[in-house]
Amino acid sequence: KYPELKILLTFFSPSGYEIRKNYAGADYIFYLPVDTPSNVKRFLDIAHPELVIFVKYEFWINYLSELKRRGIRSYLVSAIFRRDSVFFRSYGSMWRKALDAFDQMFVQSEESRELLHRIGFDNVIVAGDTRFDRVAAIARAAKPVDIVARFKGDAPLFVAGSTWGPDEDILLPLINANPKVRFVIAPHEIEESRI
């Protein structure tokens, strides 16, 4: 869509690089220089990025600090945060400050969003696991669940996951209008009053 823009794909680990070193979706592919202040400045001076995307666990403090200082937009995608990680510890202020560099964070779970919200970050969107290849592999490896197979029988099956009340209000007419379809609704929060 934007042929004048170039995509630069970097890796820190040899395993990631080896898998994607010939990836056709990027214009340039190479190793990310080690996260030292001088390396970061030199790399950014050469690359002149307009936008930077970090994936999952990529929290390079010097890169993030310099990107913020230069006003270069940065995003974090497919991130997962856990209660016991350094960001949520009393000694994690340096790491929390690094998160300030992100214009937007796309996390995999509501739990991650909640944890970040508790320490003052509202620029967080729950987007799930954006790695299509991983999602497809999980789907291919899925084992049939006997109780679901028996429930489904020969009927079409509609599954709605992580639903909220407003979602279920929309689904109700669909359910009533399709008596030959089986529905599985997995609410985001299970409340006895809604069962």
Predicted ranges, named:
Residues 1-141, 159, 163-165, 188-191:
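Active-site and donor-binding regions of nucleotide-sugar-utilizing enzymes
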Residues 1-3, 140-195:
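Conserved catalytic-core segment of nucleotide-activated headgroup transferases in glycan assembly
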